[in-house]
Amino acid sequence: MIRKSSGLRTLESALYRSGLGPVAGVDEVGRGACAGPLVVAACVLGPGKLESLAALDDSKKLTESVRERLFPVIRRYALAYHVVFIPPAEVDRRGVHVANIEGMRRAVAGLSLRPGYVLSDGFRVPGLAVPSLPVIGGDAVAACIAAASVLAKVSRDRLMVAMDAEHPGYGFADHKGYSTPAHSAALARLGPCPQHRHSFINVRRVANGSGGRVVADCKPDLPLQRDEGR
């Protein structure tokens, strides 16, 4: 594992110069949310595209408007990308960490070209068919990780906005499933819906306090979101 470098994109560029490309970056969004899917993206950018995407950074540091502007640009410049959606039920069954690692494996496996090297943001990903390296602060070191972060974030945010219409009253479009005072108040008032993760203590407490019920006015779960990429 390496830590954030002072040189922007230096690691990814060095791998390409050493002939170890294509380099795939992989990152997740939604790990700490108590509702909604865990979304993982993998992305391969050609070495000639790195400067064209100089605005890339950790998706959480970018404004929503910048992320939305970068989203189609990344998909246009990417040699390959794949976005994986892991539903709440699978997160509950596997646990967040295991689901996260499994999502990273699926995202890399779903790429339309085989990478020569994989850079993951912070987590070691065992079981990959190619060499890999976890990078702390990887969004600032490798453009491919930053691109994966934006793909995952925008994909998840858009889904949470759609989920807000399917499950009104929780404010999913605003807090995106994370624990906020408004979300906690709605959860206490309405009880959990099928998009909540019962492995999270705040959801479990409410479910147990209401006899484990799922609120009657909560519509059925959204259709399974298909993975996407090229």
Swiss-Prot record:
GO terms for molecular function: manganese ion binding; RNA binding; RNA-DNA hybrid ribonuclease activity. One of its GO terms (biological process) is DNA replication, removal of RNA primer. A divalent metal cation binds at D27, E28, D121. The keyword Hydrolase applies. It comes from the Bacteria. Pfam families: RNase_HII. Its cofactor is Mn(2+); Mg(2+). Belongs to the RNase HII family. It is found in: Cytoplasm. Its main location: cytoplasm. InterPro entries: RNase_HII, RNase_HII/HIII, RNase_HII/HIII_dom, RNaseH-like_sf, RNaseH_sf. Its EC number is 3.1.26.4. It comes from Mycobacterium avium (strain 104). The keyword Hydrolase applies. This is Ribonuclease HII. It catalyses: Endonucleolytic cleavage to 5'-phosphomonoester.
